[in-house]
Amino acid sequence: MAKGLLMTYALWAFGGPVGLHHLYLGRDSHALLWMLTLGGGGLGWLWEFWKLPSFVAQANGVQSWKQRPEEERPPLSLLRFASQMVVGVYFGLVALISLSSTANFYIVGLPLAVGLGVLLVAAVGNQTSDFKNTLGAAFLTSPVFYGRPIAILPISLAASITAQKHRRYKVSAVSETLSVRLYRVGLAYLAFTGPLAYSTLYNTAATINYAAETLGSFLSWFNFFPLLGRLVESVLLLPCRIWWLLVGAPGFNSSQFQEWEKLYEFVDSFQDEKRQLAHQVLGIPEGATNEEIHRSYRDLVKVWHPDHNRHQTEEAQRHFLEIQAAYEVLSQPKKPRASWR
């Protein structure tokens, strides 16, 4: 049956963040992705407004793209590659929070979670990728940074590159009933949310503490890249801020939600901690004016520029990078701390 554009827009408006319009159009992988990420943090859902006509046309012309020659490859998409990276990291963080206590987690659980996240994005729309090669790349990369949360990044990168290398169009498949499709999507959704829900509800304090440690370790790798660090912090805090926007009155009553409030405050506190460290690096007191910051930065750069310290190049390079990062942090206007009360 032909799909209607008006119905698609209606489902997008009223159930878009959970992928109702994608279920209607037969894009089950896209629907599952939206369910697990709330429409890509809301940004992907809004961006789709302009893409819905092409989605409907694709759904109505499903036979044409399923009959493409197998040797034809889809064009390379940087957006899809970046999405694979982000979702792979997201799946890895969820696995770290909910499954890290299991045996051989960093060799089996983590690469499996990251690889499945990458494959989910690879299967969006009329494309897919090679299951074995993508997961194989994830498992082969798992020993890099073994035992550390930062291991998520090389695993996700390797899996995303492999998925792009083996990208292809989906082949023709037998049409399935809606109940069968919903059953399969539901099982996948429960497989993702079940361990996380159990860990959260039955061991809330330990889960929050581990989440805080994991996020702290993960964010510490971005100290020398303040702009990227702020972007990562914003992405991590986005679900909390969306919840705050929806409920209207910040603050939680139950003890479990109060624990999550502490996690929000922990991640949000990185902004103040980075500014304090930046003041120490530049040797200026807190509350220093922009002129004082710039003067101290200029003086320190002259002292520690690698070209002026050829006898101690490595130490000079380290100090020079720290000074650059500190100046970049203090050059940005301080954001007001969000209050939950």
Swiss-Prot record:
Gene3D superfamilies: DnaJ domain. The keyword Ubl conjugation does not apply. It is found in: Membrane. It is a multi-pass membrane protein. Its main location: membrane. Keywords: Chaperone, Membrane, Transmembrane, Transmembrane helix. Residues 277-341 form the J domain. May function as a co-chaperone. This is DnaJ homolog subfamily C member 22. It comes from Rattus norvegicus (Rat).
